[in-house]
Amino acid sequence: MGSGPADEEHTVDTEPGVSPPRRTVGGRETVRAAVVVGALGVVFGDIGTSPIYTIQTVFNPEDPHPVPISTNNVYGVVSLIFWSVMLIVTATYVLLVMRADNDGEGGVMALITLLRRMGAVRGSRVTAVLAGLGIFGAALFFGDSMITPAISVLSAVEGLKVVEPGLEEWIVPITAVIIVALFSVQRRGTAAVGRLFGPVMIVWFVSIGACGVSGIARHPEILKALSPTYALSFFFGHFGIAFFALAAVVLAVTGAEALYADMGHFGRRAITRGWLVLVLPACVLSYLGQGALLLGDQSAVSSPFFLLAPGWARWPMVLLATAATVIASQAVITGAYSVASQAAQLGYLPRLRVAHTSESTIGQIYVPWINWVLMVSVLTLVFAFRSSAALAYAFGMAVTGTITITTLLFFYIVRTRWGTPLWLVVCGAGCLLAVDLLFLAANLTKLVHGAWLPLLIALTAFTVMTTWQRGRAIVTRARERAEGSLGDFVGQLHDYRPPLVRVPGTAVFLNRGKQTAPLAMRANVEHNRVLQQHVVIMSINTLPVPRVPDTERTEIDKLGYAEDGIVHVTAFFGYMDAPNIPDVLRLLDPAETEGPIAVDSASYFLSKIELTMGTAPTMATWRKRLFIATSYITADAAEYFGLPGERTVIMGSRIDV
């Protein structure tokens, strides 16, 4: 199976990013509020549901390194959670990392793009190594995308055993049903449901904050945990306990990467305000309230989040928590689609079939292959681990790895791209990376207890992506040598002796651009010595707009020769347009294409590469096999471009890898 025409003959013109909505004088506050509410429904679902399971996991008596419940330990853990959130989420991400954007876009892939640009300019080996580290961070995110829906929905449904212990055996089946339903509706898009996400999350944050206040009111002394002295005293006074506790404390900052990754859709200012005004206070109040509950009743450690709610509110809280965790899962699933799509555009994955589900937001996409891989993976995790506590350390490993890599890449860019003084970078990076590395080290101690899972997923994804990048570079070089210059090839057509036989009919050759000759066209000429009277060489260019009007659909180039029946057409599509080639041909002006094109009888030629195992030492044998296997998921070009199957000719060329 080849790398596929869909991967080779389709280009995407990716503009830098999606600018956040601008404020207008007349509707200044309305626009700002709408954007913040939208961010609440998409960005903060993951981090906003962390209070469900964080403290419960820290004090889990079945933990291999349990934290004993005592008054001092409760103060220390709550203080450690609070200052971890302040240092990692507020200081690292909100105040610092979110300032490093790729023309408005955020996330680890944006940092990789910046590093690749710097590497192209400077040719630095360090830049290349860090870009590779960034790819591993993106691979860790795929692991996060599998673990988040499993642990989030499980933790919410586990509230059933608090309100009705007899339902405990139904937790896993109910979770599985919710997961299947969640992934099954992805193809319909989330635009309609998404409008409800923001208001639901507002209710969620107000509710957990209110429950926290009720707990604090009963034991206001818990407010002392806001002092960093309690965190430091716990950490250094009980280092053996506190160090291992970090592996669970890090669950409080899960979703921090989402704040940065979704910056392109909502803007840094809207996300910052949503975090500081509502999300941070609500989460802190919930943690303080749960700590206060444990001060008065240590037996509540089995489920402090749900037991914090009054008895009459526990059923509604279970339902609300389930809705919130579904929203959190939706955010990370959409993030996986975006990362996969960006990885394909950067050449780390083959061209995937991407369906855009919104005309107003380019980021709302559906990638079928990724969707079903995620669903199977999430269900496997649910049935294998069966509880949120069992998944906690797998989750922590994915989070700490991504955060550490993001922080490292950020400070390298701060120094090399922004020219920040070295002493300032060393101080800032030293402090924040020390915190990140402590969390990472604590999670590494949990390798045998589940932390191996995200590393295995990340290593697998990293290997696939780097192998595809390497293999694609090998194939591209070989293909360019085989194709040759389009201008030279067209010139040679006029110099054939005896002249080429021009047979009646229209031939449409899809190609990657105007620089090289289509392999199918070259093979037809060199082997058959014939060419149709009317030849259209077409390249596809997708623009970052919903739709392109028909008046701006095409650009025609006669390639330097008039009246020879050969033209090059560049067709422009928006990301919501279905790229239908026959429809494009009907739009062409016969005066510009050297006569009318017989669309209903035209033949369409695709160049397809057959990949074979070569003897050249380009890659290890197992990587060659992996590259060839990965090529099978490339989207079918004929179907993608709307070509009639009975008049589509696929002409293959063999390339050794």
Swiss-Prot record:
Asked if the keyword NAD belongs to this entry, the reply reads no
The entry sums up its family as follows: Belongs to the HAK/KUP transporter (TC 2.A.72) family.
Highest taxon, organism lineage: Bacteria
Major location category of this protein:
membrane
- What is catalysed by this protein? K(+)(in) + H(+)(in) = K(+)(out) + H(+)(out)
Q: Name one Pfam family in it.
A: K_trans_C
What keywords is this UniProt entry annotated with?
Answer: Cell membrane, Ion transport, Membrane, Potassium, Potassium transport, Symport, Transmembrane, Transmembrane helix, Transport
- In which organism is this protein found? Rhodococcus jostii (strain RHA1)
- Decide whether keyword Secreted is in the record: no
A Gene Ontology molecular function term for this protein is: symporter activity
Q: What is this protein called?
A: Probable potassium transport system protein Kup
| Annotated membrane topology | Multi-pass membrane protein
Which Gene Ontology terms of cellular component type are present? plasma membrane
Region spans: Disordered: 1-25
Localization per record: Cell membrane
Which residues are listed as membrane-spanning? 35-55, 77-97, 127-147, 165-185, 196-216, 234-254, 275-295, 315-335, 365-385, 394-414, 422-442, 447-467
